[in-house]
Amino acid sequence: MKCAYFDANQCLSCRHLKTPLSDQVAAKTATLAALLKDLSVEQWLPPVVGPESGFRNKAKMVVLGAAHQPILGLVSPSGEAVSLCDCSLYPQDMQQLLHRLEAFVRQAGIPPYRVDKAKGELKFILLTRSQVRGEYMLRFVMRSEQAIPRIERELPRLLAEHPEIKVVSVNLQPVHMAILEGEEEIFLTEATRLEEEFNGVPLYIRPKSFFQTHPEVAAKLYLSARKWTRELAPTSIWDLFCGVGGFGLHCASKEVALTGIEIEAEAIACAKMSAETLGLDKVRFTALDSTSFASDSRGEEKPELIIVNPPRRGIGEALCHSLSEFAPKAILYSSCNPKTLAKDLHCISGYRVTKVQLFDMFPHTDHFEVLVMLQRIGE
């Protein structure tokens, strides 16, 4: 992949851009193998890769410059404000829309937030794309409600020009800190969610719902999870840190009892909607902390399979101990941080690692996703 930003030393996020993709994946595989070397992995499946450009479905743009000349991008290593609207990680239609949004901010006269002076209004523009429909969710992260009338004044023209924008909202983040978003979301459109689909499973995205950024690789990740689960044929599943339900809904069926737990209420609302669309009635999604749920469920009937898909910090010692105590037949662990994955796997007792597969969700970086199947010793 060629990148003028990287060549000009303006953006170095894709730090391994000059390394062939096959070599990147080989290095990631070696890193993972070294971390799991003490676990006697029974089967290493081939790594999964996808397009190295034009794949990303989410843009997080810092708004820089001034109201009359806004820049959507980042501050370069030299301190220069750089527009990233032409970033090759984004599909062409997203690049074009980002350019239009720079013009929108200028036409609306919204002053970008200045961190050094703690002045201004617009902090970030967050743009999310549904790959199945090519539709968008647009979020303006603002310091206050002061400039919302300016957005509302220009919005009808933007939506007329770009009917693919289905959801528009303002997120209020009043704190002078490096925090991406605040608690309050104000919708400026009737629609409040995007529709997405992977492998025939409908998923819904709301503003604060976590979603994978590489749709093609994510679809293959979900397929592997489904295949491995169906080989075990569990009758009951817990999906912890379930998000919008991607893993659990791929692994569920009308005969399987599925319980999904996620602390973010918006994501749970989306998961419930997907289950209803699929006609699954043995499903329960609840907004709770996953570790607390597991701890509070001791003494209750345990599932045959537990799926965990935690944030980068991993599942932690307390949940590792709960899983060891529950002793389900199998544990399916999806991780975006191999270091915390390795730490957690060493902490869970009574299991053997039967399958491991790497998914190159973040090309040109050191990051990747891993799917691991654990089966109880003796099963």
Curated annotation (Swiss-Prot):
Pfam families according to UniProt: tRNA_U5-meth_tr
GO biological process: rRNA base methylation
Enzyme class: transferase
EC number: 2.1.1.189
Residues that bind [4Fe-4S] cluster: C3, C11, C14, C87
Protein residues bound to S-adenosyl-L-methionine: Q212, F241, E262, N309
Catalytic activity: uridine(747) in 23S rRNA + S-adenosyl-L-methionine = 5-methyluridine(747) in 23S rRNA + S-adenosyl-L-homocysteine + H(+)
Protein's UniProt keywords contain Ion transport: no
GO molecular function, one term: rRNA (uridine-C5-)-methyltransferase activity
Catalytic site: C336
Keywords per UniProt: 4Fe-4S, Iron, Iron-sulfur, Metal-binding, Methyltransferase, rRNA processing, S-adenosyl-L-methionine, Transferase
InterPro entries xrefs: 23SrRNA_MeTrfase_RlmC (IPR011825), MeTrfase_TrmA_AS (IPR030390), MeTrfase_TrmA_CS (IPR030391), SAM-dependent_MTases_sf (IPR029063), U5_MeTrfase_fam (IPR010280)
Entry function: Catalyzes the formation of 5-methyl-uridine at position 747 (m5U747) in 23S rRNA.
Family from the record: Belongs to the class I-like SAM-binding methyltransferase superfamily. RNA M5U methyltransferase family. RlmC subfamily.
Protein name: 23S rRNA (uracil(747)-C(5))-methyltransferase RlmC
